[in-house]
Amino acid sequence: TRADQVMQALIDYEDTRQVLAHGQTKSSVVLKNALQVDLRFVDQDSFGAALHYFTGSKAHNIAVRRLALDRDLKVNEYGIFQGEKKVAGKSEEDVYASVGLPYIEPELREDRGELEAAVKGELPWLIQKEDLCGDLHVHTKDSDGKNTFQELAKAAEDMGYEYLGIT
């Protein structure tokens, strides 16, 4: 299968130093640069539940599971279940809706009041790429960057930046 091929490619990757786990749906390796890479394959109808599970902090996931229990639901990386029946999980929005919440952005999933804010409709606004006015820390070829000053200046102009700081 395609999943098997992708898993094997990770195991065989030239920068893989150590294989921690290797199976049909999950593989974990440590790269030569000491970075751990975890690769999971899930069914399409479980993708949202898996994405939610792996992008939230442990504390956030526990808090969501508590809300689910109040509704006689179980939440895990495979979906939202009522008894043995899967009732949601295709999208992250499904996960939150199943426990009575609006979608919560991954950046907020820390169990630091985001669930309470979501209930009140008071989730904070997050900075978007189009909100950026410039970049104060870029490098050119003259140090350890990959582009010339002119290329960086042109890219900054193309992105609508008002300023660019070359360090």
Positions of the model-derived regions?
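Acidic, metal-coordinating catalytic segment for phosphate/diphosphate chemistry
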Residues: 4-130
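An N-terminally biased module of ancient metal coordination in phosphate/nucleic-acid-related enzymes
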Residues: 1-2, 114-167
